[in-house]
């Protein structure tokens, strides 16, 4: 199942995410006010109080040092949102019970790719793009991807071209110490991503590779799945370095850098595309999770990458390619099902000490009695020791809900959508009728109902005994066209928080910007309503086309019209890559560029 219980390629290395930060908050500290309103992030425009200031004044305010933590706008103002792996190399391959560090693909590099231009067929000219659906949230993000490559350009082993998107799961504790460092608090956390590429998206592959044959030609396989975890992430530059860089007028991007551990395996038709299937075990101290599944040959495979945290952040800030090292040592680790011990692992075991070499996956051969215990009892991973005030007790969420929809832009579903929830009890069908509760939750920042109360959905659902899934409709409430904002819809089984799954939604406003239909759109009508926010929040865009200069915008008319069109949606080339421009904003920009009379989209 997915990366568990079958052939796999494991890799590890470094990763960079070059995101821009000012759009993570609608406010900045300014003039004695810690929460001076700068943006309206629901509409991607400026806050009314910021409008009278010039662009230069606002940029200076965003880049102003705060004294002890980067700038008013955060730790990176000039990011291009590109994600790229650094020296991520295959370290082991094989099947459960025979994973080896000497396979034919060991040492080959793994790359995520950007999109080929969907119109010209050229490229890719950039990489994958990290995008927040809700920029104010800290629970999930997305990476838009255009493909995958194994091997360098002069020795390509596998080339995939496929536009897809993955979302982060299990954004929870992964590094215990230090308690604080010169970085956002997320340096403690990890994020798990899963991508699925259909077999039809394979452009070329080395058919002499036994490692690739085992995956691509696996019986019943429909695609290739990639699961990767990034953790130990922090900005490249410290506060002192970034402030000095800005003071010198360099405005250098300051990407977040860290570690990546990943696995490639065959994908099958009955599996989720972008989240891990299987039985979920949650570390009760850190909140992070692992996943387990039985195969048909008596093996229990457990993805333990995030089950045991790392004790201490790496010693050298910018060293992201040296050996990751072992996780925290809690003593002998016991894996059990109910009262039945399945195995014990010593801290010196390769599964613990060199876990990252093996994708963090443990494969356990089981006896008949152990198999029966696994099928009927909750799994647990425990150890006797304490590290940094934490204990190791990872217990199974007996009920688990998951789905393919994690981040949804409602503009893509004008007539609403149906969400299918997968519901499991100890990895199988529910043994009795199970109630699923649905609850919409306000985001932390935009918590007034006008910003999140716009969805119609049932309050509860029932999954019948012996069933595995249930579907429900999500539509927009009547009269909600003018609303803009974000909402998380959380589903729980039998009221158990441990079973919960959430989907984030973003809604753009339907508006004419107060501009009469038929008006010829001029720069003063377009710029404050569309491009000004993007010029200030994402200045890296202006290194290609200065967004605040009318002549430059008109000079780039054709590429802008192309890149804002529906043909580029779902690619890493869509403009803007951060997907913060509403359909009405794109229409206003197009009207300005073409000279066509203003006609707001309906």
Which functions belong to the PLM regions below?
Residues 1-602:
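Aromatic- and Gly/Pro-enriched helix-to-coil junctions and flexible linker segments
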